Amino acid sequence: MSVVNFYGQLSNTQQFDQIRINIASPDQVRSWSFGEVTKPETINYRTFKPEKDGLFCARIFGPVKDYECLCGKYKRMKNRGITCEKCGVEVTVSRVRRERMGHIELAAPVAHIWFLKSLPSRISTLLDMTMRDVEKILYFENYVVVDPGLSILQKGELLTEEELQKAKDKYGEDAFTASIGAEVIQQMLKELDFSKLKQELYDELHITSSEVKKKKLVKRLKLVEDFLESENKPEWMIMDVLPVIPPEIRPLVMLDGGRFATSDLNELYRRVINRNNRLKKLIESKAPDIIVRNEKRMLQEAVDALFDNGRRGRAAKNANKRPFKSLSDMLKGKQGRFRQNLLGKRVDYSGRSVIVVGPELKLHQCGLPKKMALELFKPFIYSKLELYGIATTIKAAKRMVEAEKPEVWDVLEEVIREHPVLLNRAPTLHRLGIQAFEPLLIEGKAIQLHPLVCAAFNADFDGDQMAVHIPLSIEAQLEARVFMMSTNNILSPANGRPIIVPDKDIVLGLYYLTIAFDNEVGEGMMFSDLAEMEHALYNKFITIHTKIKYRRDQLNAEGKMVPVIIDTTYGRLMVGELLPSNPNIEFKCINKQLTKKDISLVIDLVYRHCGQKATVIFADQLMKLGFKYACSSGISFGMDDMVVPESKSTHINETQLEIKEFEQQYSNGLITYGEKYNKVVDAWSRCTDRVANDMMKEIATPPINDYPNHQRINAIYMMAISGARGSFQQIKQLGGMRGLMTKSNGQIIQTPIISNFKEGLTEFECFNSANGMRKGQIDTALKTASSGYLTRKLVDVAQDCIITEKDCGTDKGIEVKSVIEGGEIIVPLAEKILGRTAAIDIFHPVTNDLILNKGELINESKLEQIESAGLDRIMIKSVLTCESSTGICSICYGRDLATGTLVSEGEAIGVIAAQSIGEPGTQLTMRTFHIGGAATKGAEVSSVEASYDAKVKIISRNVVINSEERKIVMSRNCELLLLDDNGNEKARHKIPYGARLLVDDGDIVIKTQKLAEWDPYTIPIITEKSGKVLFKDMVEGISIRDVTDEATGIPSKVIIESKQYSRGAELRPRIQLLDSKGEVITLSNGLEARYYLPVGAVLSVEDGIQISVGDIIARIPKESTTTKDITGGLPRVAELVEARRPKDHAVIAEVDGRVEFGKDYKSKRRIIIHPIDGTLSIEYMVPKGKHVVVNEGDFVKKGDLLIDGNPVLQDILKVMGVEVLANYIVKEVQAVYRLQGVKIDDKHIEVIIRQMLQKVEVTDSGGTTLLVGEKIDRHEFDEINEKAMKNGLKPAEAQLILQGITKASLQTRSFISAASFQETTRVLTEAAIAGKVDKLRGLKENVIVGRLVPAGTGYFMDKMRKAAVKLDEENV
């Protein structure tokens, strides 16, 4: 017995390592077949026996009953293998009717519709004709010239019936050959000489210069090469013989009432057979050509309908006008073979029921209803009853179970003991949606679920249902216990934080328990042990909230117990008692008012220092304590708990006065409508916040004087502050003011809702509010589907990402630094590098001690060293730079977030990444602005303040001093840094062009000092020199217009689009500055003082006046930039991972250089960058209306924006490279999730980016057979280059290309995986022509062919099997 079979399952399934797909040749089809189907009949409706030679013929497909021939001459096993001489049926199992195929010999060749109509059409590409033309030939509309002979016709020219007749008359009957139908296409394909054609195409490709032609040639060449490599013959795309699939797969079922229900395929096959037989007769009886041709066309259409109904022309329909389901439809879509039956199967030994809460369960338990358990564990019970001799036979055992005898229950208890069951709640969005528990038998019919796992399942008890599955084999039970037990899933795989955290009531109970009140009974008493305190509590000398002193023994670093005196309360000591004793876990971590966040941190701490078992026990006890005090605290929620602040009316009156002032300014023409709108919205935002803050202050400190009638602490406030339920946003709406609302298009309505829910809304307010709420409801309904689809696409693209080795040995890595936004550090460096590995040795910058070795995992203790060393950026290894040929290595991935240790081999990190990004997707709003319709627009930023005492450093400082002695920033990329004493960056602020700087380089500033200020609503255009204004190209009514505001009657000059006028096409409105002599002033950079004005700019100066340095010439209102829809939430994530071009995308500079504006072209402006290294200048064409953020003469750096907007990802990759691109995508995706408070580890996003960067585009073929412009997998590309270099040839060159996840999934190396994702027919057609081999490396392909997935335990089985094969080969 070979080693392989030892590992093979004890079944007769074939062992194989790869699957190949090819076009079937006519001989192959005949070799599969067990006989020709010649009659369209199915079953004789009187005898119900299959008709001979029909679609269900027993002679061809096998017997209908096991070991029994059709006429009944031979029956039973003893006759197996005999073929009955009377009816011709082989005596065997009826199962063969699922396997045996038949065939139909076609009377005329027929084109396979997949190769004809699946775009790009393979047949027409090979023949170099258009698809339209090929169709005309195939469907008998036109003749094609096969051999021009003596005529002047071209080979391949199409002729209609009349033209053919004329040509025959002109050149004679036999002068040339023209033909029609599939026969001629087959002949033309047969005549193709591929090696010759390949050479011709190569030569043509090198000569041609047209890009379009090149693309076409590359496509054709690729196809020719595919045929050459796969040894497929092109004429096989035209079929002479048609396979008939086994009858059991297209069954005919009898319904009650003597009618039959049949599979659509039978009907489609019948049409083919009928038309084929008719055609045979017509050919035999030498019918006129026109009739034969019509029949051939009908046969072609019948075969088309069988293969892919509706692909061409009208779909064949049944009597009820419903289109027939063809072979293609069987595979396609959610209901197709792939997704319905191969990737999603229904399973036996399962049940489902409603869930109820089980607070007295332990974390690893669930309550299983007795009825359910009895049914699910039936076979186990039978075997045990028989084993113990309680029942003599299985039948007796069955009867006992049905009667529910008492001994059955005892046996059930025993069977169930330590046999884990799986619980699953749909939708299973991440791997924690299925977990294993030990069942406890309970009365009733509902499953009991432990409260702490609800967060992972996203379950609540308002009628949710859950499914139970029983792992049967010992291996399955083992895996369930080791990998899936709820106690082994404490940390979330998405971010490495505990997911088993107390929530809702438990948090509220613990918060209440740990409150310390002032002036409580017995304050300041001293205690030395808990019993004494309990006594005092029982006799009402203290309460659980009294501040007391307590002597407690604590473990020190040496592991000795030392007594310490602490200020605490009895409540906190109760929590403290539950803490496991460990020197790293001090009492102070819980000696405070515990909020949800604090509790989560404590659990994390316990997990890191005391391990999993201690954590589970701790969490369970914490839960019981929390429930107890949530109950005994008697916290309730009443109308009086919503406090309306007294200052509300004052704030509202002040704001209304402010808004009146804006209205006045608007009527006086000082500000535009857009500016007024922005200011009004801002004022109301500020007002709402003020009211909310006052309300919060009042809620947080309730009046103490009338205690005990009044609660010591506000219940609503407690719920929100503890993190139990509700947010301050919601409290604001209950007791403050609802604030601004959004319209359904996302615009903010200027009049806010002044009332809150306690006071009640007016009719008008109610209408406004309902509008926003409806929008929110609709969004929620729509986003669930798109979120699910995004998850599916992510899983598909990353499913073959598996950890395959320990270390790939690369030296590459990526540099990470903390994320700074608006000057605040949002994500500290520590959070970004925790659980990653160092790419280089890392030393202390001052002492030069080694902190981290290359490849060492950065854990919590190393983090402290890095933080104390004050490092602000670090090189870490990343999956993006991993060089494993298949999969990814452990070192590049780092810590497995679910366990907190280095990731093990065989872990399916791709799927985990996809789930981590997709699971929170449903929480992401479609639009970023709604909380129940309330607008959450912050006030516009118009200044920056120092957030620390620090030293100022200004980058690219370009400042002019204006007439008021103020410093005005003239640089487009000025940044202000705040440095600490060691010179480390603490904050970074972008200072916009035109801002007033209030500090200078090197100044020392104190916290909250203002550093710079600017007008947030307009972008100014500012002069660098003093001089006289001269207007150029400003033609009234064509390029500039006096706009009079209807509301105010005040005119202002505005630049307008001039292209609608013929003479306006060349106009470029600008302002020049003249000196005293009337000549144009020269600026510091050597260019003339010219200021181009974009469309929409409002002039602030008159022609001919004198202005000084730093004056504003014109303002560009910013309303045009704020109203454009900011794509947020889920659509933004989808836009990024699909690598789509954003709407209104930015243009980025490709090189460092100076900007010049060239001559305009039609409706486009020309921006030219002259590189500093003197290479060729680069031109950009941008639409005129867009706001260009650079001015003539500005110096730009590579990657700077020339036009505002989101940059195109492909541009970033081309200009800045992979690392910058990856950082950008990670930053943008994280920004969306951060807004919703969702934490996801960067490495998950990096895994997806790696999958998007799998392909390269060849730029130079070198000495290889690759074609320029061909897209190829980067590992394949490296292999080809290695071969070339071994043979002494020049290697090819290529550049990385970024693909969206859908495209990347469809172009994966595995055709099975791609076909089961989308566009099934296209993928299979391509794969068949290329004769692709699927190595079965990913998860999906293996699930589909029914093997263990090569991840987790399956990975090692796979490894062992491969080792076994090797051993066997060596032994042979």
From Swiss-Prot:
Chain residues that bind Zn(2+) 2: C808, C882, C889, C892
An annotated GO cellular component: DNA-directed RNA polymerase complex
The entry's free-text remark on the cofactor is:
Binds 1 Mg(2+) ion per subunit.
> Which keywords annotate this record?
DNA-directed RNA polymerase, Magnesium, Metal-binding, Nucleotidyltransferase, Transcription, Transferase, Zinc
Q: Origin, by domain of life?
A: Bacteria
Instruction: Name the top EC class.
Output: transferase
Query: A single GO BP annotation from the record?
Result: DNA-templated transcription
Q: Which Pfam families match?
A: RNA_pol_Rpb1_1 (PF04997), RNA_pol_Rpb1_2 (PF00623), RNA_pol_Rpb1_3 (PF04983), RNA_pol_Rpb1_4 (PF05000), RNA_pol_Rpb1_5 (PF04998)
Q: What is this protein called?
A: DNA-directed RNA polymerase subunit beta'
